[in-house]
Amino acid sequence: MLKEEDKIFINLYGQQSYDLKSSKKRGDWYNTKALLDKGRDFIIDEVKKSGLRGRGGAGFSTGMKWSFMPKNSEKPCYLVVNADESEPGTCKDRDILRFEPHKLIEGCLIASFAIGANNCYIYIRGEFYNEASNMQRALDEAYTEGLIGKNACGSGFDCNIYLHRGAGAYICGEETALLESLEGKKGMPRLKPPFPAGFGLYGCPTTINNVESIAVVPTILRRGASWFAAIGKPNNTGTKIFCISGHVNKPCNIEEAMGIPLKELIEKYAGGVRGGWDNLKAIIPGGASVPLLPKSLCEVEMDFDSLRTVGSGLGTGGIIVMDRSTDIIYAIARLSKFYMHESCGQCTPCREGTGWMWRVMMRLVNGNAKKTEIETLLNVTKEIEGHTICALGDAAAWPIQGLIRHFRDEIEERIKNFGIA
């Protein structure tokens, strides 16, 4: 359990103002120049030592990603912050954007300095109107106070931060599709290689990080890499914002230590499962794109490695709780429809496969199918998985794979009952 003094996002619930004055009282912008004066290598090394892994879903080492940027590039370098939070069940970045914007802005300055980027773009989800308004006001305050812009914080480093609003496409949360959108093109993922660190925004070296990944950096540097690394578990260090929704008594966002047991997280902060733990049917532990877990596996620890061991993933940390009243087959079919709708259509397996999977899922929902179709559906998900430019194909396949893995009997029972009816 995370100690109160170890929490990074003190204003996660918006109980205080998000303005600069209040943010400074919470410790933001304290001695930022001194942090920058320690140099780029020190900053990257500290972030590496902290063990910070990307909080957007992939879990890649943040410090390692920064180190891929060229040190003496002839082209300008860019930092891009992915604030296009559109994953069903996920709303952590939204609260940072509207209640803790200065943590993000300060993190942008430090990260930009570390990778040698004089320009940073925050790409924010189009539907986040109020969040974008709060963010822009915070940016204006930071410019007025000389915290960013020319000679940011008196460091001699110039850093401009721009807010760019998206237009509502889930696919633009994929880093290269986001870059295409920023350039004014249709948001469609790029083939890799080349990777963004070598050929990113406008063909220049670019680092793309999640909102939460960037927002925790100033606190890590102030309190030390060893402090952050001591929280959580080895290889799964630090704090994480978890979003708990669905059939719980008190849906909430909560910052906790990595590795906290899923059951403890739900019972301590979300008031428990509606109707008690015995009424639990399944949980999606990391946003809509990771496989669900049946009740028998729901006491797993919430970190990248533990969830991978049980056949799921931490993803974004968006926990969706489903009790026994849930039509689990329809719940996953609804996710299939989402991915069908959000496919950009570039890759044939995803373009054709997501629609096909949804149609078969609806047959299974009604029970109007043959048992052999279950195996056919599973085989098709495996043909889509890993055969697309981006991970949307994987994201569409995994929920169905999880359903068949853990609730195959229920699907077969529905098919059997349809014939009887």
From Swiss-Prot:
Annotated positions binding [4Fe-4S] cluster: 344, 347, 350, 390
EC number(s) given by UniProt: 7.1.1.-
Necessary cofactors: FMN; [4Fe-4S] cluster
Keywords from the named record: 4Fe-4S, Flavoprotein, FMN, Iron, Iron-sulfur, Metal-binding, NAD, Quinone, Translocase
Main EC class the enzyme belongs to: translocase
Reactions this protein catalyses: a quinone + NADH + 5 H(+)(in) = a quinol + NAD(+) + 4 H(+)(out)
Disulfide topology: none
Organism domain of life: Bacteria
Cofactor descriptive note: Binds 1 FMN. Binds 1 [4Fe-4S] cluster.
Family: Belongs to the complex I 51 kDa subunit family.
NCBIfam families: nuoF_fam, PRK13596.1
Protein name: NADH-quinone oxidoreductase subunit F
Gene source species: Rickettsia typhi (strain ATCC VR-144 / Wilmington)
